[in-house]
């Protein structure tokens, strides 16, 4: 029996889409081993200079001026018109992937990779040869829930919450194609659980922190957008009452600066990590997490019942408003 081939469409706008793509791939291997062949494609940035520029601009303003996203989001919504029934930018590369890989399932985890992409896959491979599915990671509906998510011809539309599904139904997704799946996280987030009685020991032995001091987790997405240094003065003032865990994503400069800062402030207990593969463990030993409204981080925090302090410095992005509202 030939392997089932699954093409996952994602893009590194923020870190949540890639995290869900990787989680889905990990679950496929854990459940089906070598019977399923999964290929992850960062389709936007790999397919076109225009798309790549858009991704880079998205990440740049996320880090420095989140308020600009209100205008940028409105521009991106126009893709729903350009990609009504085919792919406008990056079509040549997408066709190359389709004809070479010939997937049985095209699975999108990104709002800009549904409309047009599903129609083109059916046209090239045959409507009876390929199925198309979407996992939408939004928490709720309204301004910020991109119309690019909504492709009524989808074979299966998976929502994170019932609230988000209700909005998708109103926007045109047929009810018989809808499913609420919940959080799409990597397997280890479900299986690597620290018992409550062992959490203090984890802080001390694995992180070098004090066992019983209030622990604040300053998080960031995979791309490393953060304002840790703006929050440090308030934490240092309370060095006898709290300690901190910092992660920096792929922001090497932020990591280097924090390491240097730590060497000059021995009075404050903190643990610093760059791109972390153990966020699910760090959350379990934290008393509170400070984060923006990114869906992946907030989903993990809710899953592990870690209280969230939302970081609105620089403004709230439209997509983040959906998380805040939920």
Language-model segments: which ranges?
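Nucleotide-activated sugar donor-binding and catalytic core shared by glycosyltransferases
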Residues: 1-326
């Amino acid at each position: 029996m030939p392997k089932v081939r699954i093409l996952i469409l994602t893009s590194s706008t923020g870190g949540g889409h890639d995290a869900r793509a990787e989680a889905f791939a990990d679950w496929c291997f854990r459940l089906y081993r070598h019977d399923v062949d999964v290929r992850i494609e960062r389709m936007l940035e790999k397919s076109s200079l225009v798309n790549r520029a858009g991704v880079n601009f998205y990440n740049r303003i996320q880090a420095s001026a989140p308020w600009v996203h209100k205008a940028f989001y409105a521009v991106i919504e126009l893709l729903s018109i350009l990609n009504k029934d085919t792919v406008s930018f990056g079509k040549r590369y997408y066709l190359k992937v389709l004809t070479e890989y010939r997937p049985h399932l095209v699975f999108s985890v990104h709002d800009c990779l549904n409309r047009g992409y599903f129609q083109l896959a059916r046209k090239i491979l045959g409507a009876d040869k390929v199925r198309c599915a979407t996992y939408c990671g939004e928490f709720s509906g309204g301004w910020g829930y991109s119309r690019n998510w909504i492709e009524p011809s989808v074979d299966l539309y998976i929502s994170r919450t019932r609230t988000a599904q209700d909005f998708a139904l109103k926007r045109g997704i047929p009810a018989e194609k809808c499913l609420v799946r919940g959080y799409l996280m990597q397997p280890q987030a479900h299986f690597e659980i620290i018992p409550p009685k062992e959490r203090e020991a984890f802080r001390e032995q694995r992180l070098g922190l004090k066992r019983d001091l209030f622990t604040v987790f300053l998080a960031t997405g995979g791309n490393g957008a953060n304002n840790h240094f703006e929050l440090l003065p308030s934490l240092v003032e309370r060095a006898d009452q709290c300690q901190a865990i910092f992660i920096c994503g792929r922001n090497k400069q932020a990591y280097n600066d924090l390491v240097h800062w730590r060497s000059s402030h021995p009075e404050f207990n903190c643990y610093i990590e760059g791109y972390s593969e153990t966020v699910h463990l760090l959350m379990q030993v934290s008393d509170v997490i400070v984060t923006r409204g990114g869906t992946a981080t907030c989903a993990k925090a809710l899953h592990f019942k870690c209280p969230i302090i939302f970081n609105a410095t620089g403004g709230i992005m439209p997509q983040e408003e959906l998380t805040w509202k939920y």
